[in-house]
Amino acid sequence: MRTLYIDTSSSYLYSAIVEDNNILGEIKEEYGQSLSEVALPRIVSIFNDNNIKPEDIDKIIVVNGPGSFTGIRIGITIAKVYSWSLNIPITTITSLEAMSLSSETAKYHVPAIDARRGYVFAAIYDKNNRQILKPQHIKIEDLKQEMSSLDDYVVITNDEYLDEDFDNIEAYNPNLLKIVNYYKDKEPINPHAINPDYLKLTEAEESKMN
């Protein structure tokens, strides 16, 4: 079984093609604001470098948020086009769960993404990936309160701005093989039903409400 994984929910592109228990090709690169321009060509390069055709993919897993609003849309669009045009089953995973799955260093995992203005996108999972606190847009101080009862935790993030707010920081380094193997048997979703899960309103939506 060959699975294509796509995560463009941050300034990084994380993508891989996994066959059974082997990574055939992967990308873990930071592109910043140029991600929208390079995401598709770099994903195509994984196919080309490994002599794999898109129609050889059996499953697609795409991160649907939270994170960068623009980035999330890019990854979802690419994944949906592959899925719909080639009739490839597709499913989603949250960026926070992917972050949690990639850590092995503590009893509790607290993936956190800077959401500005004193907020983060965050969740809490135990080491067996059982959800303790559901993914949400939460004040940093409120998250600290939720964490106060945890006896052994790590905060997983790639946002250096959060280093001042939390102890026990671990830089996010995605374990793409583990993520894919954990989710490859998840029930597929109609590609037309897949939408970004921002966990908060966009700034444009917030402006309309004010």
Which residue ranges define each predicted feature?
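N-terminal beta-alpha supersecondary unit
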Residues: 1-62
